[in-house]
Each structure stands twice: as C-alpha cells, then as structure tokens.
Amino acid sequence: MTDILTNIFTILSRMSLAEGFGFNTDIFETNILNLAVVLGILLTSGREFFVSLLQNRQQNILQSINDADERYKEAAEKLQQAQNEFEQAKLEADQILAQSKKTASEIEVGLMNLIKEDTKKLLDMKQATISFEEEKAISEIRRQVIRLALQRALEQSKSRLNRRLQKRVTRLNIGLLGRLVTPNDV
C-alpha cells in the first residue's frame, strides 16, 4: 500500500506545471484539490483497511451488546430468584411469627392454669394447717382444762373430806359396783 502511495506522489511530482497538472504545495490555493486527491487515494487504497477496521469495531460493539444482554438476562434471573426467595422467607417468617404467638398464648394459658392450681393447693394446705393447728390448740386447751378441773376437784375433795366421809363414799361406790356386777359375770 505504501508503494502505491509513493508511486502516485512520484508521478504527480514529475509532471510539469506546463502540462496543466502538478503538485502545488501552497495549501491555501489548492486545498480542495489536494483534499480530493488525498481522499481518493485513501478511499481506493485504504478502503479494505477501513472496512475491516469498521467491521471489527462493529463486531466488538455487537459482542459487547450481546454480552451486556446476557448479563442483563442473568441479572434479571438472579433478581427474580432473589425476589422468590425473599417472598418465601417472608412467608416462613410470618408462619414462624404466627406459630410463636400461638405457642406463647398456649404457654401463657398453661402457666395461668398452673398458677391457679398451685394457688388452690397452697390455699388448701393453708386451710388444712390452720385446721390442724386449731384442733391441736383445742385439744391442748381441753387437756389443760381437764387437768385443772381434776386438780381443783382433788384439792376441794381433800379439804372437804375427812376420814369418815371418805369411808362412806368408798362403801357407796363399792355397793354401786356390786349391783352392776351380777354373780353370773364373775
């Protein structure tokens, strides 16, 4: 390709000015002509290069678009999967919350029943203890009253009875016992 360009410039430089065509180095005078020549040379000799360059660029752009589209599809699938997992986790969390509320309610009812039962048992035990202590106190008071009554009766009988009266009471009691016991009983 460089050989072609060199040949073209060589031919153009050998042409004389008298022939009407030549290479003018004054940019301001021949700018359009020079540009047309350069573009013509570039289009004819560099066309394949530019076409292949543009095709490579087009393929790279298409490949980038396809890659981006694939990544978008993968991201969309992952997003959908994550949303599904989130919804599933949300449902499970709601179920766990409902179950925990139900369990807490059942435990609360169970504990309240246990508290009621324990309270009833404690009240029953309290009442039984009070009744036992009352019976014990009443029994103790009875024993003391009986002991005091016997002691007092004994003291009174000692002070009132003399020997003669004692013999008489003893005979009377023996007589009463004798009537109660019949000869067949002995």
UniProtKB/Swiss-Prot annotation:
It is found in: Plastid, Chloroplast thylakoid membrane. In plastids the F-type ATPase is also known as CF(1)CF(0). HAMAP family: ATP_synth_b_bprime. The chain crosses the membrane at residues 27-43. F-type ATPases have 2 components, F(1) - the catalytic core - and F(0) - the membrane proton channel. F(1) has five subunits: alpha(3), beta(3), gamma(1), delta(1), epsilon(1). F(0) has four main subunits: a(1), b(1), b'(1) and c(10-14). The alpha and beta chains form an alternating ring which encloses part of the gamma chain. F(1) is attached to F(0) by a central stalk formed by the gamma and epsilon chains, while a peripheral stalk is formed by the delta, b and b' chains. Belongs to the ATPase B chain family. It is a single-pass membrane protein. The gene is atpF. The keyword Cytoplasm does not apply. This is ATP synthase subunit b, chloroplastic. GO terms for cellular component: chloroplast thylakoid membrane; proton-transporting ATP synthase complex. GO terms for molecular function: ATP binding; proton-transporting ATP synthase activity, rotational mechanism.
